[in-house]
Amino acid sequence: TVAAALESGAITGNEHYQCNGSLEVGGHTIKCHSYRSGGEGDVSVQDSIAWSCNVALMKIAATMGKEEFAKFQQIFNFGLKTNVDLAGEARTASLLFPVDQMGSADLATNSFGQNFNVTMIQVASAFCSIINGGNYYQPHVVKKITDENGNVIQEDNGTLLKKTVSSSTSELLKQYLYATVSDGTGKYAKVPGYSMGGKTGTAQKLPRGQGNYLVSFIGFAPVDNPQLLVYVVVDEPNAEEEFHSTFAQEIAKGIFEETLPYLNIYPDEDIVVTEETDPAEAPADGTTDVPDSAPEDSMVDQTPDIAEETVPPEDGLQPQDV
């Protein structure tokens, strides 16, 4: 949403928004994760990502309009096959709102990832283009094939398919995603010594009363020259309270810790020692951190047209349709 708004010229990145915890859109009260505490207050464009502020994202999408929003969904290849070299990839066009059927409430909830579905490979491919300067490459599973002597038989050097955003928009998004990991909802994925960026996700699953969630984290390192992207989704974490995205962050952190040295990617930041927090005690991403909060009503009152099995994430990139 933010990348599309910046690229379309709907925002400059200098805007600020007031979050009082909820927003009335199309006859519906759509809530932010901080609604029980009165909202986030003054929220910058960077904060809308770093803090996962639904209200700010809804206002950004409204400024952009549904036509531009739908156009950029297609630019990022949502609803289209990626043609990754794996069998069975399905089209997901029917899981997105056509622009002529997208109402104001649909646009509002779509702005933070609810009410449309994309695959993990679609998310990863689009996300890579956002952080690499705007270049969307054909995704592949295997980089190269060698014989028993190490001779390369076949190698994929990357096929550039299109440009999604400008290099200036990409630089801004990397800055915002860096803030998410350094001081936002993604700080539990931080590996000491490495500059990292990322985004958290929290998806409510129906029926909401059962308190089941799908949580995710997508992150990259290092920030200036991204070399590694990790995307983790945890379906119904084995915990009393499932809605903490920190469960996915902890897994992602472990992968980063093992993989960065293996790839000879060296630390690029000073190590700062911080106090560890148990993921189960951390504030939920996309859900209020007030203990008496009921996850089942943390999103939309009278939500229309919700999928039968899951509700897409209320705060970020869509981890469904695995």
Each predicted region: which residue ranges?
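Short, well-ordered alpha-helical segments
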Residues: 167, 171, 246-254
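Beta-lactam-recognizing serine transpeptidase/beta-lactamase-like catalytic domain environment
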Residues: 3-234
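Short, solvent-exposed mixed-charge patches
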Residues: 319-322
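Intrinsically disordered, low-complexity acidic/polar segments
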Residues: 227, 239-241, 262
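Short A/G/S/P-biased low-complexity tracts
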Residues: 18, 314-317
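A short acidic/glycine-rich loop-to-helix N-cap element
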Residues: 235-247
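Short, gly/Ser/Thr-rich active-site loops of penicillin-recognizing serine hydrolases
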Residues: 151-157, 249-309, 315
